Amino acid sequence: MRGGTSALLHALTFSGAVWMCTPAEALPIQKSVQLGSFDKVVPSREVVSESLAPSFAVTETHSSVQSPSKQETQLCAISSEGKPCRNRQLHTDNGYFIGASCPKSACCSKTMCGPGGCGEFCSSNWIFCSSSLIYHPDKSYGGDCSCEKQGHRCDKNAECVENLDAGGGVHCKCKDGFVGTGLTCSEDPCSKRGNAKCGPNGTCIVVDSVSYTCTCGDGETLVNLPEGGQGCKRTGCHAFRENCSPGRCIDDASHENGYTCECPTGYSREVTSKAEESCVEGVEVTLAEKCEKEFGISASSCKCDNGYSGSASATSHHGKGESGSEGSLSEKMNIVFKCPSGYHPRYHAHTVTCEKIKHFALDGAGNHDTTTYVARRRYPASL
């Protein structure tokens, strides 16, 4: 170190490094600070010298950098913003000065920068923040800003995390399955229970500590669930196309599930209690058509038992094929069957049908019907 005036040089050894300090009255316009094999030039500032450096202990800690999210609470900070310790600056191995701030409520020392350091600027990588000692770049510090000292403030369902880089500090982080600031944590609404509501193709997103929303996949729509909350529901032909086979699926937002079926000849559209549509074999016919086509008798011969009501214009599901098939009409439409010549009644459990036993002319033109028609309808077994 060069200088026109006599200067007292103090050489101190600490943690394997050589620290050098010049008393305040001997500072030139610029001073050279030796840190190991590095010579750095720093601007002169007004300083207050200390004849003796304080004694302290350092606890070294090593960890990877973990920055807190916006939701998590930082208990104490190690930052480069220069707030609230604007009179403190940290000298790095790259030769730059950066601002340094202390933990909340801690006061930055105006006169102590560590052994060999004097005044407002530190001539080493040490700075004092009240009882806290922060060391860069080896990522070690002692004092107040540590999980050992601050971690008790975290919620019981949180863990304390140390970030030892500039800009870091100590913060609380809620454990897996919990959300919140870290000071307070509650059960994550997007746990397995929430993801199940969003469906296999949906994604659960936390809104706050008690509510969630879903982003839905293709063919799904966000709906309010009867039991509360939201979920993803399969809608439209993307989800129900196979239901309409062998017919055609048509997207239709006016229907509850976002589609409707267009069924081919010989099939009719059927809607379940869940508002799902499909094409089933058979056609919708009136009661008059049922009497004429299924039983070969006129509509006037069809009548209801005592205690029941109905009309020949009522519609029923008319099927072809298996005898004894069950339909979907109410049992109140209880028809009295009078099988015509060439037919005989066949009784099943709760079902009665008239089966054709030979070719029978349905009209006066001599046309013969060779199809076996079966009533797909439930009736009392007493018939």
Swiss-Prot record:
Provide the alphabetized UniProt keywords.
Cell adhesion, Cytoplasmic vesicle, Disulfide bond, EGF-like domain, Endoplasmic reticulum, Glycoprotein, Golgi apparatus, Secreted, Signal
* Pfam families for the chain: EGF_3
| UniProt xrefs under Gene3D superfamilies | Laminin (2.10.25.10), Plasmodium vivax P25 domain (2.90.20.10)
| Keyword Glycoprotein included in the entry's annotation | yes
Specify the signal sequence span.
1-26
Result of mutating residue 354 to G? Does not affect dimerization
Q: What is its main location?
A: cytoplasm
Which cysteines link up through disulfide bonds? Answer: 190-204, 198-214
Location in the cell reads: Cytoplasmic vesicle, Secretory vesicle, Microneme; Secreted; Golgi apparatus; Endoplasmic reticulum
Propeptide part(s) removed at maturation, as residue ranges = 27-66
SMART domains xrefs: EGF
For this protein, what post-translational modification is recorded in UniProt? Answer: Removal of the propeptide occurs in a post-medial-Golgi compartment. Removal of the propeptide is required for the host cell binding. The presence of propeptide does not affect dimerization. The presence of propeptide does not affect sorting to micronemes.
Identify the stretch(es) annotated as Lectin-like.
67-145
Going by the UniProt annotation, this protein carries glycans at 201
Domain (EGF-like) spans 186-227
Q: Where is this region: Involved in dimerization?
A: 294-359
The annotated region (Required for proper sorting to micronemes) lies at 146-189, 190-236, 237-290
Tell me yes or no: is Lipoprotein among this UniProt entry's keywords.
Answer: no
Report quaternary structure and partners. Answer: Homodimer; dimerization is likely required for host cell binding but not for trafficking to micronemes.
Role according to the record: Adhesin; can bind both the host cells and the parasites. May be involved in parasite invasion by acting as a bridge between the parasite and the host cell. Triggers innate immune responses in mouse macrophages via the TLR11/MyD88/NF-kappa-B pathway. Induces TNF/TNF-alpha secretion in mouse macrophages. Induces secretion of IL6 in mouse and human macrophages likely via different mechanisms. Up-regulates expression of NOS2/iNOS in mouse macrophages. Induces mouse macrophage polarization.
The protein here is known as Micronemal protein 3
